[in-house]
Amino acid sequence: MIHLIKDILTSEPKGQAIDVYGWVRTKRETKNLVFIEINDGSCFASIQATFDRDTGLDNNTEALLKKAGTGVSVKVSGNLVPSPAAGQRVELQANNIHIFGDADQEKYPLQKKRHSMEFLRDIAHLRARTNTFGAVARIRSQMAYAIHTFFQERGFQYVHTPIITGSDCEGAGEMFHVTTFDIEETVKKALKEKKDPDSFKIDYSQDFFGKQANLTVSGQLEGETYATALSRIYTFGPTFRAENSNTSRHLAEFWMVEPEMSFFTIKENMELAEEFIVYLLKWALEKCKEDLEFFDSRIKKGLIEMLKNVVNTPFTRLTYTEAIAELEKHIDRFEFKPYWGCDLQSEHERFLTEEVYKGPVIVTNYPKEIKSFYMKLNEDGKTVRAMDVLVPGLGEIIGGSEREENLDILQGRIKELGLREEDYWWYLDLRRYGTVPHSGFGLGFERLLLYVTGMGNIRDVIPFPRAPKLAEF
């Protein structure tokens, strides 16, 4: 059986024979000893294998040890013993080494030094071998597991929503189109027929799906169809935005967690969102201790304390109108001046959480003009039952709402926003047949990971980032 290093490090050292598999992180030598640090990615820590020349290493082992530089993949055999060195419980008294794959030390990009994030993005296929990105990957895995565990424990059904869709959930139009048409041939044909460029339109009825199709921006609308049959569901999958934003906060491909709950009003929706965030941060603090300690010391000082503060502080609830009134008291503090009807900017969100309320905040009842068509209209006719969960150090981490269950009002909102009702016929059917109050929210998975890890760029918390002019690997 092949043992992971994380299990070996916590096992009882009794001199038992064991094989260690992994990649060499560092090697150092004295006259009689060779020390090799081996890591397999299963945990942050490496295990030290010590070769003692006084025991009589054969020529083959000596030759292999010379080749065992950083990045070389190995199997090292020996006996597991208590370590005399400070900071480690066990080490391997090694007697044999096998090299699976060499790594030319002159060419291997990951040298024994700190590399910049920009450099590591250029070699995203290798960056998971570093301490930083190995820790990001493990936390990403744990957070995904925690998300499924949270919802499964509460009776939610996991639903797979389509990647290719004919609808635009957000109504923003910033979507990647999916087509089997040959673009060059389509252009050549139009030029040959001397069609007026201003009047030329592609006939998608002849395309693969018989209509214009896109990559999904959200699984919410499809999720609602199952929530109105199974009561509580959640989706967790990739979404896509063709937004030409080249910033540290935007990706063209990212993962979304979207629960939808029948019979939930905005009140229950807020309660679930708060419970969800607290659950995830507690999970990270308990299950990812070693990796979080690394991020706290090397990436963002005070990270663990910030996460604990969110876990231990009740979420303040206030309306959008109350938030604007509070922000207007300090209007000179902001680059973007707040006013009723504006979308809250990151600087506003962080001011509310970090300086006014000193903890997480849930803002509700936003102006309808800045929110999506499916959000429930309030009695005032001006605001909708939207909610945003804001946390210190980041700003918005969750966005959601009570959904509009009234057919006439929903049709009016679709018309008001200039959307085509025929594109949403099936969504409107949910209001025609057994409509119910229902609510939901969305959590951007990478935004959660930015928060938990303290990393500064969203491109560094996803294995292979997709952004404008960036589609390598």
UniProtKB/Swiss-Prot annotation:
Xref: NCBIfam families: asnS, PRK03932.1
Family per similarity comment: Belongs to the class-II aminoacyl-tRNA synthetase family.
Main location: cytoplasm
Subunit structure: Homodimer.
Catalyzed reactions per annotation: tRNA(Asn) + L-asparagine + ATP = L-asparaginyl-tRNA(Asn) + AMP + diphosphate + H(+)
Keywords: Aminoacyl-tRNA synthetase, ATP-binding, Cytoplasm, Ligase, Nucleotide-binding, Protein biosynthesis
EC number per UniProt: 6.1.1.22
SS bond list: none
Gene Ontology MF: a single term: nucleic acid binding
Subcellular location: Cytoplasm
Protein name: Asparagine--tRNA ligase
Lineage, uppermost ranks: Bacteria, Pseudomonadati, Spirochaetota, Spirochaetia, Spirochaetales
Enzyme class: ligase
CDD domains: AsxRS_core, EcAsnRS_like_N
PROSITE patterns assigned to the protein according to its UniProt record, in alphabetical order: AA_TRNA_LIGASE_II
Pfam families: tRNA-synt_2, tRNA_anti-codon
Gene Ontology BP term (one): asparaginyl-tRNA aminoacylation
Cross-referenced Gene3D superfamilies: Bira Bifunctional Protein, Domain 2 (3.30.930.10), Nucleic acid-binding proteins (2.40.50.140)
Key word Cytoplasm present: yes
GO cellular component, as recorded: cytoplasm
Gene expressing this chain: asnS
